[in-house]
Regions:
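Cell-envelope/extracellular polymer assembly enzymes that use nucleotide-activated donors
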Residues: 15-18, 46, 191
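Short, acidic, metal-binding catalytic loop of nucleotide-sugar glycosyltransferases
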Residues: 35-44
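A conserved acidic beta->alpha catalytic loop
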Residues: 43, 49-61
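Glycine-rich, basic loop-to-helix element that forms the pyrophosphate-binding segment
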Residues: 79-96
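Short aromatic/hydrophobic "clamp" motif used to bind/position activated sugar donors
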Residues: 101
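Conserved donor NDP-sugar-binding/catalytic core segment of glycosyltransferases
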Residues: 113-145
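A recurrent flexible, glycine/aromatic-enriched loop bordering the glycosyltransferase active site
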Residues: 129, 137, 143-169
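Acidic donor-binding loop at a coil-to-helix junction in glycosyltransferase catalytic cores
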Residues: 185-192
């Protein structure tokens, strides 16, 4: 599928999309996520960055955006360094100006067509929210790339087929991330997804996982074991990867990962991208 091809011309949207990033002290990663935002083809958008990092870090983010000429970025400091991840995400929602919200993690990357395609899909299905069912996953330091399918070839349906970090939704004041307890610091996006899924129509975005790259780099919220378990349980087969090799070769041009890159399916190495 051509990701830029509209599902239906009537399903185009011009609503502002607010991309919401929470970050602290991962400057190199945050810069790449900002660049990913800057390269989006969807025109009416903003990037709201909420950080409890120190002033030099905040200044570095602002300077990077200004020097690169990237418009529509706001860097906000909550005034406290003791807030949970869930509380910081809620601050980003409150600060958003758009009618559509999109989670924009500082260590994941989106294809330039991601916002346009997901917003169009959500509108076409008259949904309150949308999540990908599949995405790319890059594992360091080995440097291998996989295509993760949360639906597990269709065996998972409903909530279990959705990738929580890929949220896009219409603004809705009913929904907030947990701000206390263990879920407020890790897994808050899964809890939020459960709440949204139970309350509004959700449009799963299937088969377009090349539009989103999930990266393990050693400083993620979740452990290496978690990321490897995601790969072991949900990696697409080598045959599926070979079928979509041309799509992968084109998509990988937009992602900041080293080449050559080994593409690995559930049976092992499939091919190499240069």
């Amino acid at each position: 599928m051509n990701p830029s091809a509209p599902e239906n011309a009537a399903n185009e949207t011009t609503a502002m999309i607010s991309c919401l990033m929470v970050t602290k002290d991962r400057l190199a990663l945050a810069k790449l996520a900002i660049r990913s935002y800057a390269e989006q083809t969807y025109p009416d958008r903003e990037l709201v960055i909420v950080t409890d990092g120190e002033e030099p870090f905040r200044s570095a983010l602002t300077s990077y955006a200004d020097e690169a000429g990237i418009a529509g970025i706001r860097v906000l400091h909550p005034g406290s360094s003791r807030l949970t991840l869930g509380a910081l995400r809620n601050i980003s929602i409150q600060a958003a100006r758009g009618d559509i919200l999109c989670q924009w993690d500082d260590d994941d990357y989106s294809h330039p067509e991601r916002l346009a395609v997901q917003a169009r899909h959500m509108l076409a299905h008259a949904a309150g929210a949308s999540f990908f069912t599949d995405h790319l996953q890059y594992i360091e330091p080995e440097g291998f790339l996989s295509w993760i399918d949360w639906s597990m070839d269709g065996r998972n349906q409903g909530l279990r087929q959705l990738a929580p970090g890929t949220l896009m939704m219409h603004r809705d004041a009913r929904f907030r991330y947990p701000e206390s307890g263990p879920d407020a610091r890790r897994g808050e996006d899964w809890v939020f997804m459960e709440t949204v899924y139970a309350a509004v129509p959700v449009a799963p975005l299937k088969g377009l996982g090349h539009l989103y790259l999930y990266r393990y780099h050693g400083r993620n919220t979740h452990s290496r074991e978690h990321h490897m378990n995601v790969w072991a349980d949900r990696a697409r087969s080598n045959a599926q990867l070979l079928h979509d090799a041309a799509t992968l070769r084109d998509a990988i041009r937009h992602y900041p990962i080293p080449r050559p890159c080994s593409v690995v399916g559930r049976e092992g190495p499939a091919f190499v991208l240069n």
